[in-house]
Amino acid sequence: MRLVFAGTPETALPALHQLIDSPRHDVIAVLTRPDAASGRRGKPEPSPVARAALERGIPVLRPSRPNSAEFVAELSELAPQCCAVVAYGALLGDALLGVPPQGWVNLHFSLLPAWRGAAPVQAAIAAGDAVTGATTFQIEPSLDSGPVYGVVTETIRPTDTAGDLLGRLAVSGAELLSATLDGIAEGALTARPQPADGVTLAPKISVEQARVRWELPVPIIERRIRAVTPNPGAWTLIGDLRVKLGPVYLDAAVEPPGPLPPGAIQVDRKHVWVGTGSEPLRLGQVQPPGKKLMNAADWARGARLDPSVRAS
């Protein structure tokens, strides 16, 4: 089939390369978000998908208004039979959805109808789900609600960060998307409606929502930290200093100190403990402003934290 591939971040690259390499499909163009400011200088940089497409000689479309009449006409001139989507990052209007005769097929990183929205992997980890996966479905105007073509499942490991899990789903999801498009091209695949029950939402996580709430119990804090690693990144105030946090330790072999109030900090020779709504939690790595990730105990000794300082 003649395909237009729509995607933006690195997560979309396995699917893009798989479709370009497929003998059954012809990726005639890539649709991605406009160049965005990056780095300290704020210089506009192409998206990872744009860079990969250009390296492979695929034309790149970067409309600032993808639902405009002008872009709908531009896409229509390309005459794609189907459009494949992986984390494009913009809502698609009715006119755009009506361009390809086989519609728009989206790869979503959850087992729909669970975790519809922009942050399904993060939501699954934060909720403590044991299993998640990826789903291919036909895009319709409402959010992630279209009929399903296929799914692949993935176990969530106890130490998975969102980055770890998304990396695996990007690879297995690429296989699923390719197989889905093969089935559509052959006329052998029919989408089925999503169940009405089991719908949960996974909106984008803001920086403020990634702030650790120490009054919560340890299992919830630990999952939430993994869920926002690497982006937007867990953080807390230690005194008046904003510090990013890496995944924390849940090691039964290390005896925690006595009870600590939520946010209270205790530093010993090898560990930094913070009080929570349950037992104290041992920090792993921290990233003070302007520095790289480092061992929490090493940082605490160097910073000479006042015994009265708290995390908040």
UniProtKB/Swiss-Prot annotation:
GO terms for cellular component: cytosol. It holds the Pfam family Formyl_trans_N. One of its GO terms (molecular function) is methionyl-tRNA formyltransferase activity. Gene3D superfamilies: 3.40.50.12230. It is an enzyme of class 2 (transferase). Transmembrane segments: none annotated. InterPro entries: Fmt (IPR005794), Formyl_trans_C (IPR005793), Formyl_transf_N (IPR002376), Formyl_transf_N_sf (IPR036477), Formyl_transferase-like_C_sf (IPR011034), Met-tRNA-FMT_C (IPR044135), Met-tRNA-FMT_N (IPR041711). (6S)-5,6,7,8-tetrahydrofolate binds at residues 110-113. Keywords: Protein biosynthesis, Transferase. It catalyses: L-methionyl-tRNA(fMet) + (6R)-10-formyltetrahydrofolate = N-formyl-L-methionyl-tRNA(fMet) + (6S)-5,6,7,8-tetrahydrofolate + H(+). Its EC number is 2.1.2.9. SUPFAM superfamilies: FMT C-terminal domain-like (SSF50486), Formyltransferase (SSF53328). Attaches a formyl group to the free amino group of methionyl-tRNA(fMet). The formyl group appears to play a dual role in the initiator identity of N-formylmethionyl-tRNA by promoting its recognition by IF2 and preventing the misappropriation of this tRNA by the elongation apparatus. PANTHER family: METHIONYL-TRNA FORMYLTRANSFERASE (PTHR11138), METHIONYL-TRNA FORMYLTRANSFERASE, MITOCHONDRIAL (PTHR11138:SF5). Belongs to the Fmt family. This is Methionyl-tRNA formyltransferase. It comes from Mycobacterium ulcerans (strain Agy99).
